[in-house]
Curated annotation (Swiss-Prot):
This is L-arabinose isomerase. Its EC number is 5.3.1.4. Keywords: Arabinose catabolism, Carbohydrate metabolism, Isomerase, Manganese, Metal-binding. One of its GO terms (biological process) is L-arabinose catabolic process to xylulose 5-phosphate. One of its GO terms (molecular function) is manganese ion binding. Mn(2+) binds at E308, E335, H352, H453. It is an enzyme of class 5 (isomerase).
């Protein structure tokens, strides 16, 4: 059970701008330099998708053809542009206006240092990126096209890191636009923040969110073969510290939990879904509220999952899982539960009754246990119990439906070890230090209308989510080490004004 590589077969096209004015020899040098640069970037190991160099762009027709092909190719997740020489920006207009893939402008050059003693006009004519990129940047800004700008010599490690982070955001956007979310049941009764406009979500994020009757899941449960259940149980035994009682007197409960996982996975795969959500108020004839199965959605399958009908967080977890593929850490549903208000040691503890995923990293081998659950009205559910592994500069991200648009809200946090054993707490959890402080972070979070459900990512941090929000054209409010409550409130007011004016459809 291994998550499919979301970067397999995916490409980022590299378009280099120039013009015929400079002659064949100059254009030959442009092509040689561009190939050297792309080869170097591909060999850094920091960019998870392959960068593919396309023929030098020298005309309006060539640019449009390039952009149309990139937009139509399902394997292309993004486009990088760079102008080696001066490239008149009017020739980019028609192409840029038909581009539907994420755009990154790389402001770089082939040479690292100015050749002080030998530089002449031939060199100047060939190496004009410093003003070629400004010309290109002007037209992109004039057209109102959002893009990421990365500046630096192509051999600078920071350049490859930023390109790699952006490539991950592109993959997250690709996953979002190909996502189907399976809802078993509806939203938890009377809860506000987990509601949302599913039609608007498909317009904005490309994700198709639909409901399947819980009775269909029950039918899938009844159809599961014992061999599939036993295979899943063997996987449990290999990866977790299984309570001996579950292999003896409570084996039937373990079998049921594994069978529920198999049923959910079978339904998801049969319908091409990559995120799911259930609701403890709507379980039909299921024997248990699913626990260990949903916990494994992000870690084993790379899927999103959330609880209580909260499809918005399930979408975020899937996006986070894709963006973080191949990195240490992962993505999981998280819910704020309790504060530690000790002066100088302020902490937030997040958890959920069953569904927090070990994908975020665990301090010790997760324990597979069975405990009573006071809600849902079903048999005692089997769940993984662990504490999240410490991680610097992790993030918690929420999505709220604020009437005419969606708002993403993010807090940068440091996950830390719990200060006690938590031996009486029969569920998975994580403890973190919010930035800039617990009081400021919570005040800002509440002011922005952030959800109590979040997606925690320990694999990718702030920049990946900022890149994703820019690509999606969605508001993102950020709480970090530099945030003050007064400044945040003012920025939020300006952001609300901008997004309300900019989201008139």
């Amino acid at each position: 059970m291994v998550m499919e590589n979301p970067f397999e077969g995916k490409e980022i096209w590299f378009g280099v701008g120039s013009q015929d004015l400079y002659g064949e020899e100059a254009l030959r040098q442009v092509a040689i330099h561009s190939a050297e640069m792309v080869d170097y970037l591909n060999n850094t190991g920091k960019i998870p998708a392959k960068i593919v160099l396309k023929p030098t762009l020298k005309s309006s027709d060539g640019v449009k053809e390039f952009m149309v092909e990139a937009s139509a190719n399902p394997n292309v997740i993004g486009v990088i542009t760079w102008c080696h020489t001066f490239s008149p920006a009017k020739m980019w207009i028609r192409g840029l206006e038909v581009l539907t893939k994420p755009l990154l402008q790389l402001a770089t050059q082939h040479h690292k240092e100015i050749p002080w003693e030998t530089i002449d006009m031939d060199f100047m004519n060939l190496n004009q990126a410093a003003h070629g990129d400004r010309e290109f940047g002007y037209i992109v800004s004039r057209l109102g096209i959002k893009r990421k700008v990365v500046v630096g010599h192509y051999t600078d490690p920071e350049v490859a890191e930023k390109l790699g982070t952006w490539a991950r955001a592109c993959a997250g956007w690709d996953a979002s636009n190909n996502m189907k979310v399976m809802r078993w049941g509806d939203n938890m009764r009377n809860v506000a923040v987990t509601e949302g406009d599913k039609t608007e979500a498909e317009r904005v994020f490309g994700a198709s969110i639909n409901t399947w009757a819980v009775n269909e899941l029950v039918a899938a449960y009844d159809a599961v073969k014992d061999d599939q259940v036993k295979e899943i149980i063997e996987d449990y035994k290999a990866k977790y510290d299984v309570d001996p009682a579950l292999l003896d007197a409570k084996y039937d409960s373990l079998f049921i939990a594994a069978k529920e996982e198999a049923a959910m996975v079978n339904m998801m795969r049969a319908n091409g879904c990559t995120a799911g959500v259930d609701n403890f108020e709507d379980l039909g004839a299921l024997p248990q509220l699913p626990g260990v199965g949903p916990q494994r959605f992000p870690s084993e399958y790379g899927w999103g999952f959330s609880a209580e009908g909260d499809w918005k967080t399930a979408v975020l977890v899937r996006i986070g899982a894709v963006m973080g593929y191949g990195l240490e850490g992962g993505a999981s549903l998280m819910e704020d539960y309790s504060y530690n208000f000790t002066e100088g040691d302020e902490l937030d503890m997040g958890s959920h009754m069953l569904e927090v995923s070990p994908s975020i990293g665990t301090i010790a081998k997760p324990k597979l246990e069975i405990h009573p659950l006071g809600i849902g009205g079903k048999a005692d559910p089997v769940r993984l119990v662990f504490s999240g592994k410490p991680a610097k500069d992790a993030v918690v991200v929420s999505m709220s439906d604020v009437r005419e648009r969606f708002r993403l809200l993010m807090d940068v946090v440091d996950v830390v070890e719990p200060q006690g054993s938590l031996k009486e707490l029969p569920c998975a959890r994580a403890v973190w230090e919010p930035k800039p402080s617990l009081k400021t972070a919570v005040e800002c979070w509440i002011t922005a209308g952030g959800s109590h459900h979040t997606c925690m990512t320990t694999s990718v941090g702030r920049e990946a989510w900022e890149d994703f929000a820019r690509i999606a054209g969605v508001e993102l409010a950020v709480i970090d080490e530099n945030t003050t409550a007064r400044q945040f409130e003012k920025e939020l007011e300006l952001s609300e004004m901008y997004h309300r004016l900019n989201n008139q459809h």
